[in-house]
Amino acid sequence: DKAAPYKSWRYQWNVSGVHDVDQIEWRGDYPVAVLELTTNPTIDQKVKDRVAHRLWYEFSGKKLRHVAKALGVPFYIVLMDFNVEEITVCHQTSPESGWVDMPRDVYRHWLSSLQPLRSTKDTSDTKTTNSQ
Protein backbone atom coordinates (compact mmCIF):
# COMPACT_ATOMS: atom_id res chain seq x y z
CA ASP A 1 0.00 0.00 0.00
CA LYS A 2 1.76 3.13 -1.24
CA ALA A 3 -0.34 5.30 1.06
CA ALA A 4 0.64 3.40 4.24
CA PRO A 5 2.96 6.13 5.57
CA TYR A 6 0.26 8.77 5.09
CA LYS A 7 -2.40 6.57 6.70
CA SER A 8 -0.17 5.83 9.67
CA TRP A 9 0.50 9.54 10.14
CA ARG A 10 -3.16 10.55 9.65
CA TYR A 11 -4.51 7.94 12.08
CA GLN A 12 -2.44 9.58 14.85
CA TRP A 13 -4.28 12.89 14.68
CA ASN A 14 -6.72 13.56 17.45
CA VAL A 15 -9.32 14.97 15.06
CA SER A 16 -12.59 13.09 14.65
CA GLY A 17 -12.07 9.99 12.52
CA VAL A 18 -10.86 8.69 9.20
CA HIS A 19 -11.48 5.50 7.27
CA ASP A 20 -10.43 4.38 3.83
CA VAL A 21 -12.88 2.66 1.50
CA ASP A 22 -11.55 -0.50 -0.12
CA GLN A 23 -13.74 -0.43 -3.20
CA ILE A 24 -16.71 1.35 -4.72
CA GLU A 25 -18.00 -0.58 -7.71
CA TRP A 26 -19.30 1.60 -10.56
CA ARG A 27 -21.34 1.10 -13.73
CA GLY A 28 -20.76 4.11 -15.93
CA ASP A 29 -21.59 7.19 -13.88
CA TYR A 30 -23.43 5.26 -11.16
CA PRO A 31 -22.17 3.54 -8.02
CA VAL A 32 -23.54 0.03 -7.49
CA ALA A 33 -21.88 -1.16 -4.25
CA VAL A 34 -19.45 -0.39 -1.46
CA LEU A 35 -17.13 -3.34 -0.79
CA GLU A 36 -15.01 -4.02 2.27
CA LEU A 37 -12.26 -6.44 1.20
CA THR A 38 -10.69 -8.55 3.93
CA THR A 39 -8.48 -11.62 4.02
CA ASN A 40 -7.76 -14.52 6.33
CA PRO A 41 -5.54 -17.57 5.80
CA THR A 42 -8.53 -19.86 6.37
CA ILE A 43 -12.24 -19.26 6.08
CA ASP A 44 -14.69 -20.99 8.37
CA GLN A 45 -17.84 -19.98 10.22
CA LYS A 46 -15.90 -18.62 13.21
CA VAL A 47 -13.90 -16.31 10.93
CA LYS A 48 -17.07 -15.20 9.14
CA ASP A 49 -18.78 -14.49 12.48
CA ARG A 50 -15.79 -12.53 13.77
CA VAL A 51 -15.53 -10.40 10.61
CA ALA A 52 -19.28 -9.75 10.49
CA HIS A 53 -19.33 -8.78 14.18
CA ARG A 54 -16.39 -6.41 13.77
CA LEU A 55 -17.90 -4.72 10.73
CA TRP A 56 -21.33 -4.36 12.30
CA TYR A 57 -20.33 -2.99 15.69
CA GLU A 58 -17.02 -1.18 15.19
CA PHE A 59 -16.22 2.20 13.66
CA SER A 60 -15.10 0.98 10.24
CA GLY A 61 -18.23 -1.01 9.43
CA LYS A 62 -20.54 1.70 10.73
CA LYS A 63 -18.83 4.30 8.57
CA LEU A 64 -18.75 2.08 5.49
CA ARG A 65 -22.50 1.42 5.83
CA HIS A 66 -22.96 5.18 6.16
CA VAL A 67 -21.04 5.74 2.91
CA ALA A 68 -23.11 3.06 1.15
CA LYS A 69 -26.34 4.60 2.42
CA ALA A 70 -25.25 8.07 1.27
CA LEU A 71 -24.53 6.64 -2.19
CA GLY A 72 -27.80 4.70 -2.18
CA VAL A 73 -26.08 1.35 -2.72
CA PRO A 74 -25.65 -1.90 -0.78
CA PHE A 75 -22.68 -2.64 1.47
CA TYR A 76 -20.92 -5.97 1.00
CA ILE A 77 -18.12 -7.63 2.92
CA VAL A 78 -15.89 -9.72 0.67
CA LEU A 79 -13.82 -12.19 2.69
CA MET A 80 -11.16 -14.22 0.90
CA ASP A 81 -8.13 -16.35 1.60
CA PHE A 82 -4.69 -14.98 0.75
CA ASN A 83 -4.67 -16.65 -2.70
CA VAL A 84 -8.20 -15.48 -3.59
CA GLU A 85 -9.20 -19.11 -4.06
CA GLU A 86 -11.95 -19.04 -1.44
CA ILE A 87 -14.36 -16.09 -1.58
CA THR A 88 -17.41 -15.48 0.54
CA VAL A 89 -19.69 -12.44 0.45
CA CYS A 90 -21.98 -10.91 3.07
CA HIS A 91 -24.57 -8.28 2.14
CA GLN A 92 -24.51 -6.73 5.59
CA THR A 93 -27.92 -5.35 6.48
CA SER A 94 -28.05 -6.66 10.07
CA PRO A 95 -25.77 -8.32 12.63
CA GLU A 96 -27.14 -11.70 11.50
CA SER A 97 -26.68 -11.23 7.74
CA GLY A 98 -25.56 -14.46 6.11
CA TRP A 99 -22.64 -15.31 3.87
CA VAL A 100 -22.60 -16.75 0.35
CA ASP A 101 -19.55 -18.80 -0.66
CA MET A 102 -18.58 -18.24 -4.29
CA PRO A 103 -15.98 -19.79 -6.56
CA ARG A 104 -13.91 -17.16 -8.38
CA ASP A 105 -15.91 -17.41 -11.62
CA VAL A 106 -19.23 -17.09 -9.77
CA TYR A 107 -17.92 -14.09 -7.81
CA ARG A 108 -16.75 -12.44 -11.02
CA HIS A 109 -20.14 -13.01 -12.66
CA TRP A 110 -22.01 -11.76 -9.57
CA LEU A 111 -19.91 -8.61 -9.21
CA SER A 112 -20.03 -7.89 -12.94
CA SER A 113 -23.81 -8.25 -12.93
CA LEU A 114 -24.48 -5.58 -10.29
CA GLN A 115 -26.49 -2.73 -11.74
CA PRO A 116 -27.38 0.74 -10.41
CA LEU A 117 -30.47 0.85 -8.26
CA ARG A 118 -33.29 2.87 -9.75
CA SER A 119 -33.14 5.27 -6.79
CA THR A 120 -29.44 5.90 -7.47
CA LYS A 121 -30.06 6.74 -11.11
CA ASP A 122 -33.13 8.87 -10.33
CA THR A 123 -31.44 11.01 -7.70
CA SER A 124 -27.99 11.32 -9.25
CA ASP A 125 -27.68 14.73 -10.84
CA THR A 126 -23.93 14.94 -10.38
CA LYS A 127 -21.84 13.87 -13.34
CA THR A 128 -18.93 11.72 -12.18
CA THR A 129 -16.82 11.76 -15.32
CA ASN A 130 -14.90 14.59 -16.93
CA SER A 131 -16.22 15.87 -20.24
CA GLN A 132 -12.75 16.38 -21.73
Briefly describe each language-model feature range:
Residues D1-D29:
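Active-site metal-binding core of divalent-cation-utilizing nuclease and nuclease-like domains
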Residues S16-H19, Y30, L55-H66:
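Short, well-structured alpha-helical interface segments that form or flank functional binding sites
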Residues V21-E25, D29-Q45:
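Conserved catalytic cores of phosphodiester-cleaving nucleases, focusing on short active-site segments
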Residues I24, T42, K46, S124-K127, ...:
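Intrinsic disorder/low-complexity detector
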Residues L35-T38, Y57, V78-M80:
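Short His-Asn-centered micro-motif
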Residues P41-K63:
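Mg2+/Mn2+-dependent nuclease catalytic core
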Residues K62-C90:
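Nucleic-acid nuclease catalytic cores
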Residues D81-S131:
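Domain-level recognition of nuclease-like catalytic cores that cleave nucleotide substrates
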